[in-house]
Amino acid sequence: VWLRAASMAEGYWRNGQLVSLVNDEGWYATRDRGEMHNGKLTIVGRLDNLFFSGGEGIQPEEVERVIAAHPAVLQVFIVPVADKEFGHRPVAVMEYDHESVDLSEWVKDKLARFQQPVRWLTLPPELKNGGIKISRQALKEWVQRQQ
């Protein structure tokens, strides 16, 4: 998604200089991935979160939306883990409204096989202590330690 408007910020201050937010034509790259359907823009997710598994692109936010539709799910995050065969594989880190639920069967007809998590982990309380937003980087590091 790229934006251009008359009311955009001039830039940000770095090392004593104003650094422009826009390219030479005045466009700002949001680093969001979007899709346009019938004149309506839908934000799909952050480009920084996109990863590949067996040559297939996985946008974590798309998978998270599907899993979050289950009534027992309070929060879900999809993070990549390194895999020798596929490059990366998706792992779900979840918070439930009660004891953990097996969602691997539930997602089979809702997600493509490459999008289906290979592991389902419960969100640890220590990752929720930093405020409202949970860091994807902290989640990735935590998942790596669980290997």
Task: Give the ranges of each region predicted by the language model.
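Short secondary-structure edge/capping micro-motifs at helix/strand boundaries
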Residues: 18-19
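AMP-binding/adenylate-forming catalytic core of the ANL superfamily
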Residues: 5, 10-11, 26, 31-115, ...
